[in-house]
């Protein structure tokens, strides 16, 4: 492709609203442009990268036995109402009405549509298993779109769905697609981890996220320093053991703590270590209010609270709800004196506290010498806190470290969550009606482009891996007015294309500095510069990833490039 014919507007300055490298560079290099908050146009070079990621996805999905189809972006509300998600999915679901006031959603995901499609067509175990996928635009009404393609309101996604007669069949396909995902992200050149995850609004169980390691990631990964264990911090169980001290229990005492609300403030004011304080929080579990206790140096993991109750929705109780329940401010909450009708659950670590402190459910006061079971009753001790760095790894090997990650893929074992809700059944080999067993597998295709850009860049621009680069080679005749340089550049361009390489020829009448700056921004794997030594048959070859350059004879160029790009 000749650069003079391409729409690739570059920017010298960093856009003011672009916070992270991938967002900045994809805009500066002319790979995309913003249409509205969280909505982007892919320009020609960006679209080439997107298509290359799509191709890798398609190759690996089809190798895993999945078949492509395409479903509508606009979905009837009735299907979402049938599954129950019309009411539970929340405000991120983009809803609309047609001229007849019939309600629709713009698809954030397609479980309902695919289940409806398959239940009408697949009636026998003989047609199972079946794995279908699509690559299609999704919509999500993000409250705060940010980070460019990483959190947008419109994005390209590959979503696959598998249908099975048995759990064993689901397990087999799940493992196959797990490996396909690993292959996809490895082929894209990404440094990633597959981690144990929470299924969230999707439902189901046994789920893994594929996380690209990056400091700008919105998720925290807990991983072992000596084993392969990795999990989203929300899902990492705590296996610590707590030893109760043999300190004698002291008499409970209420003390004044004026203007001291946070654990750090209270512990400093009372000269008590945070790990001897009891942190009390009120959660709304579906429609039930529950008091949750953790040690003062720990944080409540609301996903674990949700899993204790098998709840659909768990959120912190509002200030008004806390006031009505316990007649106190949030900063003064404590378990002592709580009405017996209100359930109290606690993390395992709380049981080991001796002569600790807690809120007194009275503004400006706390209790000291608090002892669980003597001073208050707990209905259940269980794992309720977030794992911390330095904790023992849940697999028993090594200790936990943290890293940030960008979620680019997610695989779920949905089970019968949707098939039961939507009456999607089949006849098994005994002629009995059974609900279809399902799996769900998603990849953020446009998000993967951003994740690659986030991992592969330097101070000068993008540094694309060969597999997804818009072109393999960038040929730059420095001076297009020089017949020797122009002709050699065009000859190299034609010759490399004949060898099967994708080549970009900078045939613009621009200054050398502009050409080189744009080349660095674009980040193609190899740059061939045709300069003043063209008369001698010599060109300069530069590897973008390493910055290494070498002058070689033009007749050696094809072999040289083949060695770089092999």
Curated annotation (Swiss-Prot):
Localization of this protein: Cytoplasm
UniProt keyword Nucleotide-binding present: yes
GO cellular component, one term: cytosol
Similarity comment: family membership: Belongs to the class-II aminoacyl-tRNA synthetase family. ProS type 1 subfamily.
Disulphide bridges: none
Domain notes for this protein: Consists of three domains: the N-terminal catalytic domain, the editing domain and the C-terminal anticodon-binding domain.
GO molecular function annotations of the record: aminoacyl-tRNA deacylase activity; ATP binding; catalytic activity, acting on a protein; proline-tRNA ligase activity; transferase activity
Catalytic activity line of the entry: tRNA(Pro) + L-proline + ATP = L-prolyl-tRNA(Pro) + AMP + diphosphate
Keyword vocabulary terms for this entry: Aminoacyl-tRNA synthetase, ATP-binding, Cytoplasm, Ligase, Nucleotide-binding, Protein biosynthesis
Superkingdom field: Bacteria
Function: Catalyzes the attachment of proline to tRNA(Pro) in a two-step reaction: proline is first activated by ATP to form Pro-AMP and then transferred to the acceptor end of tRNA(Pro). As ProRS can inadvertently accommodate and process non-cognate amino acids such as alanine and cysteine, to avoid such errors it has two additional distinct editing activities against alanine. One activity is designated as 'pretransfer' editing and involves the tRNA(Pro)-independent hydrolysis of activated Ala-AMP.
GO biological process: prolyl-tRNA aminoacylation
EC assignment: 6.1.1.15
Stored InterPro entries: aa-tRNA-synt_IIb, aa-tRNA-synth_II, aa-tRNA-synth_II/BPL/LPL, Anticodon-bd, Anticodon-bd_dom_sf, Pro-tRNA-ligase_IIa, Pro-tRNA-synth_IIa_bac-type, Pro-tRNA-Synthase_IIa_type1
Protein name: Proline--tRNA ligase 1
């Amino acid at each position: 492709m000749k650069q003079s014919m391409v729409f690739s507007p570059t920017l010298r300055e960093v856009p003011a609203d672009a916070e992270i490298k991938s967002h900045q560079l994809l805009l500066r290099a002319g790979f995309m442009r913003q249409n509205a908050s969280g909505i982007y146009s892919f320009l020609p070079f960006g679209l080439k990268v997107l298509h290359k990621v799509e191709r890798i996805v398609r190759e690996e999905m089809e190798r895993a036995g999945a078949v492509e189809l395409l479903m509508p972006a606009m979905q009837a509300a009735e299907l979402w109402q049938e599954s129950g998600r019309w009411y539970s999915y929340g405000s991120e679901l983009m809803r609309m009405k047609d001229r007849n006031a019939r309600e629709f959603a713009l698809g954030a995901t397609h479980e309902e549509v695919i289940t409806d499609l398959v239940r009408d067509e697949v009636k026998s175990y003989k047609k199972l298993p079946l794995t279908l996928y699509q690559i299609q635009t999704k919509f999500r009404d993000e409250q705060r779109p940010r980070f460019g393609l990483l959190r947008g309101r419109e994005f390209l996604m590959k979503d696959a769905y598998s249908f099975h007669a048995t759990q064993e069949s689901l397990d087999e396909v799940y493992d196959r697609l797990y490996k396909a995902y690993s292959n996809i992200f490895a082929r894209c050149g990404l440094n990633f981890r597959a981690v144990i995850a929470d299924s969230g609004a999707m439902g189901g169980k046994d789920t893994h996220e594929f996380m690209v390691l990056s400091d700008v990631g919105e998720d925290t990964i807990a991983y072992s320093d000596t084993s392969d264990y990795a999990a989203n911090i929300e899902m990492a169980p705590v296996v610590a053991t707590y030893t109760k001290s043999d300190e004698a229990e002291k008499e409970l005492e209420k003390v004044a703590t004026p203007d001291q609300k946070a654990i750090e403030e209270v512990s400093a004011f009372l000269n008590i270590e945070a790990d001897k304080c009891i942190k009390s929080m009120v959660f709304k579990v579906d429609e039930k209010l529950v008091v949750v206790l953790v040690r003062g140096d720990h944080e409540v993991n609301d996903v674990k609270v949700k899993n204790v109750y098998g709840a659909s929705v768990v959120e912190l109780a509002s200030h008004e709800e806390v006031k009505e329940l316990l007649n106190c401010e949030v900063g003064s909450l404590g378990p002592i004196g709580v009405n017996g009708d209100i359930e109290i659950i606690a993390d395992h670590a709380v049981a080991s506290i001796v002569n600790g402190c807690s809120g007194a459910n009275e503004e400006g006061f706390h209790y000291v010498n608090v002892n669980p079971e003597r001073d208050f009753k707990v209905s259940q001790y269980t794992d309720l806190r977030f794992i911390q760095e330095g904790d023992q790894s849940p697999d028993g090997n090594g200790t936990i470290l943290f890293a940030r990650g960008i979620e680019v893929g997610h695989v779920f074992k949905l089970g019968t969550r949707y098939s039961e809700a939507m009456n999607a059944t089949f006849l098994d080999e005994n002629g009995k009606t059974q609900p279809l067993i399902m799996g769900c597998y998603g990849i953020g295709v446009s998000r993967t482009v951003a994740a690659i850009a986030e991992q592969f860049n330097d101070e000068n621009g993008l540094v694309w891996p060969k597999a997804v680069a818009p072109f393999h080679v960038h040929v730059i005749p420095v001076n297009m007015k020089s017949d020797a340089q122009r002709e050699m550049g065009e000859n190299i361009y034609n010759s490399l294309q004949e060898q099967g390489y994708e080549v970009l020829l900078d045939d613009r009448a621009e200054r050398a500095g502009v050409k080189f700056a744009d080349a660095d921004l674009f980040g193609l794997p190899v740059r061939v510069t045709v300069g003043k030594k063209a008369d001698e048959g010599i060109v300069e070859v530069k590897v973008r990833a390493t910055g290494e350059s070498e002058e070689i004879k033009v007749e050696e160029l094809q072999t040289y490039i083949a060695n770089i790009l092999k």
